[in-house]
Amino acid sequence: MKPNNLSFWMQSLDMSPYSASSDPALLLPSYQCDVAIIGGGFSGLWLAYYLKLAQPETKIALFEAQHIGYGASGRNGGWLSSNIPSVINNLLKHPSITPAQIQLLQRQVINTIDVVDDVCQQEQIDCDLHKGGLLFIATNEAQIERLQHYHESELAYGFAEHELNMLSAAESQQHINIPSMVAALHYQHGARIHPAKLALGLRERLLGMGVAIFENTPVRAFSKNHLDLGKSTVQADKILCCTEGYSDQILHNRKIIPVNSSIIMTKPLPESFWQRFGWQNNELLGDVAHLYIYAQKTRDNRILFGGRGAPYQYNSVDAGVGQLDGNTTQQLYQRLGELFPDTVFEIDRAWKGSLGVTRDWNPSVSYSAEQGLGFIYGFGGNGVGPTNLAARTIVDKICGRYTELTALPWNDYQCPTWEPEPFRWLGIQSMYKMLAAADKLEYGLKLKKSAFFAGTAYKICGLD
């Protein structure tokens, strides 16, 4: 059975040791477990993994509406990254959150890259993980100013000086020979992965540990100790909701909305391409345009290239199976060609996915022992690493342990709600139109600073 998801990652699993097909576990009309986890993405998978390690006798069941890795965890850019700028910037606005807490969060996110790598080695999960670092590039002077600001902010809130380097054009092109690049910020910490291999590898390990996994089993509603599956009911001492961009379908509280990100994947590129453009260290690649791109060089010498495209659908409609429109595909192809000129790329696959965004772009990790209810959500497209950290955090909370993780500023964080429609749609569409105009103005007029109205656009949707 092919996965109901159009991403290259999921569709390529037939060529890997993992299989996206599954035989759902038998679910009786009434089922009982100690812990029920809703959502089969990275948050739910990591949570089941660490909880089973901490409490081997606990009966854990994971419920997924589609198949493991159906959502963003099987569609993302494969960035196991140390970079969480929007989270840091927005947490700084809260007087109750100290700089020391923010620095601790950043250090934990950095350390999580090694944590994930260690688990993959211990559990023999081959997910193409390669630690090549991260390169954010600038292609005009306004973007150089933003890179310098990022550099200063990162050093102030958690990064050590040796972990970051501002690079000139010549220094940058020693990493990747992009002709239009005028500067770059290089991060020592960053790794590319094949996200679907990680998700399905975790699934395989969880089954071996005795975790029950129910795929194609949507949860319609839940309350204390009770899950409603339509034809079945589940009684559980603890219920943990890990549904990210799909959360509003079950929570109906406007805390989180699905924002789409779009990706194209090239066919494998010849050695002559890599001799010309470099990229020998396999760095993650991004830029600091307002409508930014992200990319990776895959193990088999493809380029994954992503951006926002059509970011938000009215009334929080999610990305479905990931069918990407031709206009967005063409926009991404054009931008790819601008960075790597005089190259004809063959596109193997194009898709989109829904990431989860809160009103202030801050994630939240919460657990109430009294209610037996927990929630992980709001990574805003930066969840490949932080979901692992969030899972370890909530396991500490469940086990009653007071640790560095339970002191992180996202613990029990209360996100504001999004506006109702049509105001939500109007605001998001306005933001993206203004950011597109800001990029165009910065290039066209060769501005030395960010376009003045870009800040207004960020404020509209809580990014500034």
Locate predicted features.
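Extreme N-terminal leader/targeting segments of oxidoreductases
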Residues: 1-35, 53-54, 58, 459-461
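Active-site substrate-recognition segment that forms the wall
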Residues: 78-80, 123-129, 219-221, 233-272, ...
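Glycine-rich FAD pyrophosphate-binding loop
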Residues: 52-75
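Flavin (FAD/FMN) cofactor-binding and adjacent substrate-gating region
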Residues: 2-4, 16, 86-93, 118-132, ...
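Active-site-proximal substrate-binding core of FAD-dependent oxidoreductases
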Residues: 397-431
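Glycine-rich Rossmann-fold phosphate-binding loop(s) that bind the pyrophosphate
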Residues: 39-45, 65
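Glycine-rich active-site loop/strand segments that organize a redox cofactor
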Residues: 75-108
